[in-house]
Protein backbone atom coordinates (compact mmCIF):
# COMPACT_ATOMS: atom_id res chain seq x y z
CA UNK A 1 0.00 0.00 0.00
CA UNK A 2 3.01 2.28 0.24
CA UNK A 3 2.15 3.66 3.66
CA UNK A 4 4.00 4.58 6.79
CA UNK A 5 2.25 3.80 10.05
CA UNK A 6 3.01 5.31 13.44
CA UNK A 7 1.03 4.17 16.46
CA UNK A 8 2.13 5.81 19.68
CA UNK A 9 1.34 4.94 23.26
CA UNK A 10 -1.37 7.57 23.79
CA UNK A 11 -3.61 6.06 21.08
CA UNK A 12 -2.75 8.63 18.42
CA UNK A 13 -2.90 7.27 14.89
CA UNK A 14 -0.69 8.62 12.12
CA UNK A 15 -0.48 7.18 8.62
CA UNK A 16 0.86 8.25 5.24
CA UNK A 17 -0.73 6.55 2.24
CA UNK A 18 -0.85 6.67 -1.53
CA UNK A 19 -3.99 8.29 -2.90
CA UNK A 20 -5.61 5.12 -4.23
CA UNK A 21 -8.89 3.37 -3.48
CA UNK A 22 -7.02 0.26 -2.35
CA UNK A 23 -4.89 2.26 0.10
CA UNK A 24 -8.04 3.91 1.49
CA UNK A 25 -9.66 0.50 2.10
CA UNK A 26 -6.54 -0.76 3.87
CA UNK A 27 -6.30 2.43 5.92
CA UNK A 28 -9.91 2.12 7.09
CA UNK A 29 -9.21 -1.44 8.19
CA UNK A 30 -6.16 -0.29 10.20
CA UNK A 31 -8.18 2.51 11.80
CA UNK A 32 -11.00 0.13 12.75
CA UNK A 33 -8.52 -2.27 14.32
CA UNK A 34 -6.66 0.49 16.16
CA UNK A 35 -9.71 2.22 17.65
CA UNK A 36 -11.79 -0.91 18.39
CA UNK A 37 -12.31 -1.01 22.14
CA UNK A 38 -11.09 2.57 22.57
CA UNK A 39 -14.32 4.19 21.36
CA UNK A 40 -17.88 2.91 21.12
CA UNK A 41 -19.01 0.85 18.12
CA UNK A 42 -21.23 3.74 17.03
CA UNK A 43 -18.33 6.20 17.21
CA UNK A 44 -16.10 3.76 15.35
CA UNK A 45 -18.67 3.36 12.57
CA UNK A 46 -19.02 7.14 12.32
CA UNK A 47 -15.23 7.60 12.23
CA UNK A 48 -14.94 5.01 9.47
CA UNK A 49 -17.75 6.62 7.45
CA UNK A 50 -16.36 10.16 7.75
CA UNK A 51 -12.82 9.08 6.89
CA UNK A 52 -14.01 6.91 4.00
CA UNK A 53 -15.82 9.90 2.49
CA UNK A 54 -12.92 12.26 3.19
CA UNK A 55 -10.17 10.00 1.83
CA UNK A 56 -12.22 8.93 -1.18
CA UNK A 57 -12.74 12.62 -2.00
CA UNK A 58 -8.95 13.01 -1.99
CA UNK A 59 -8.57 10.05 -4.36
CA UNK A 60 -11.41 11.02 -6.71
CA UNK A 61 -11.15 14.81 -6.77
CA UNK A 62 -7.80 16.03 -5.45
CA UNK A 63 -5.47 13.47 -6.99
CA UNK A 64 -7.15 12.01 -10.09
CA UNK A 65 -4.67 10.63 -12.60
CA UNK A 66 -1.73 11.49 -10.33
CA UNK A 67 0.66 8.64 -9.75
CA UNK A 68 2.39 10.59 -6.99
CA UNK A 69 -0.79 11.37 -5.07
CA UNK A 70 -0.20 11.02 -1.37
CA UNK A 71 -2.20 11.72 1.76
CA UNK A 72 -1.47 11.65 5.45
CA UNK A 73 -3.87 11.14 8.30
CA UNK A 74 -3.40 12.08 11.93
CA UNK A 75 -6.01 11.23 14.57
CA UNK A 76 -5.52 12.50 18.10
CA UNK A 77 -7.90 11.53 20.90
CA UNK A 78 -8.77 14.52 23.05
CA UNK A 79 -11.39 15.45 25.59
CA UNK A 80 -14.72 15.33 23.79
CA UNK A 81 -13.70 13.61 20.59
CA UNK A 82 -11.11 12.72 17.99
CA UNK A 83 -9.17 15.55 16.34
CA UNK A 84 -8.52 14.50 12.73
CA UNK A 85 -6.18 16.11 10.21
CA UNK A 86 -5.97 14.97 6.59
CA UNK A 87 -3.23 16.36 4.35
CA UNK A 88 -2.80 15.69 0.63
CA UNK A 89 -0.64 16.91 -2.22
CA UNK A 90 -3.54 17.11 -4.66
CA UNK A 91 -5.44 19.88 -6.35
CA UNK A 92 -6.84 22.63 -4.11
CA UNK A 93 -10.51 22.83 -3.22
CA UNK A 94 -12.48 24.88 -5.76
CA UNK A 95 -12.01 28.58 -5.01
CA UNK A 96 -9.77 27.55 -2.09
CA UNK A 97 -12.82 27.02 0.11
CA UNK A 98 -14.84 24.22 1.63
CA UNK A 99 -17.75 23.10 -0.56
CA UNK A 100 -21.33 23.99 0.44
CA UNK A 101 -22.85 21.74 3.10
CA UNK A 102 -26.14 21.33 1.25
CA UNK A 103 -27.42 18.04 -0.12
CA UNK A 104 -28.06 17.73 -3.85
CA UNK A 105 -31.65 18.10 -5.00
CA UNK A 106 -33.61 14.88 -5.00
CA UNK A 107 -37.06 16.26 -5.80
CA UNK A 108 -36.86 15.18 -9.41
CA UNK A 109 -37.57 12.16 -11.57
CA UNK A 110 -35.44 9.08 -11.00
CA UNK A 111 -33.47 9.47 -14.24
CA UNK A 112 -32.33 12.94 -13.14
CA UNK A 113 -31.24 11.99 -9.62
CA UNK A 114 -27.58 12.82 -8.96
CA UNK A 115 -25.08 9.98 -8.61
CA UNK A 116 -22.93 11.90 -6.16
CA UNK A 117 -22.80 14.95 -4.00
CA UNK A 118 -23.94 13.31 -0.78
CA UNK A 119 -20.53 12.65 0.80
CA UNK A 120 -19.58 16.18 1.77
CA UNK A 121 -22.91 17.02 3.46
CA UNK A 122 -22.67 13.66 5.25
CA UNK A 123 -19.22 14.57 6.59
CA UNK A 124 -20.56 17.94 7.76
CA UNK A 125 -23.42 16.24 9.63
CA UNK A 126 -21.02 14.36 11.90
CA UNK A 127 -18.07 16.68 12.49
CA UNK A 128 -17.37 19.95 14.30
CA UNK A 129 -14.66 22.61 13.93
CA UNK A 130 -14.32 21.89 10.21
CA UNK A 131 -11.43 23.87 8.71
CA UNK A 132 -9.60 23.86 5.37
CA UNK A 133 -6.48 25.64 4.26
CA UNK A 134 -3.77 25.18 1.66
CA UNK A 135 -0.13 25.67 2.56
CA UNK A 136 2.88 25.07 0.33
CA UNK A 137 0.92 23.05 -2.23
CA UNK A 138 -0.68 20.86 0.45
CA UNK A 139 -4.38 20.68 1.32
CA UNK A 140 -5.00 20.52 5.07
CA UNK A 141 -8.43 19.51 6.34
CA UNK A 142 -9.09 19.51 10.08
CA UNK A 143 -12.18 18.41 11.96
CA UNK A 144 -13.27 17.16 15.34
CA UNK A 145 -15.36 14.02 15.47
CA UNK A 146 -17.22 14.46 18.77
CA UNK A 147 -17.82 11.58 21.12
CA UNK A 148 -21.48 10.70 21.24
CA UNK A 149 -21.40 8.89 24.56
CA UNK A 150 -20.35 10.01 28.04
CA UNK A 151 -16.86 9.09 29.20
CA UNK A 152 -15.71 8.25 32.70
CA UNK A 153 -13.28 10.90 33.92
Q: What is each of the regions a protein language model found here?
A:
Residues 1-14, 59-153:
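Conserved beta-strand-loop-beta-strand hairpin that lines the nucleotide-binding pocket
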Residues 8-42:
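Helix-loop-beta hinge of the Bergerat
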Residues 25-28, 47, 54, 66, ...:
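Bulky hydrophobic/aromatic packing residues
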Residues 28-52, 56, 112-113:
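Conserved short strand/loop->alpha-helix "switch" segment adjacent to the catalytic nucleotide/phosphoryl-transfer site
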Amino acid sequence: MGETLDLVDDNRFTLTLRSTSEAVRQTLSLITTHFAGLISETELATLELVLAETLNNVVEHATPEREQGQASLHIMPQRGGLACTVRDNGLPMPDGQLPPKRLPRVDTIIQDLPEGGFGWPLICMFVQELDYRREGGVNILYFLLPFTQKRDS
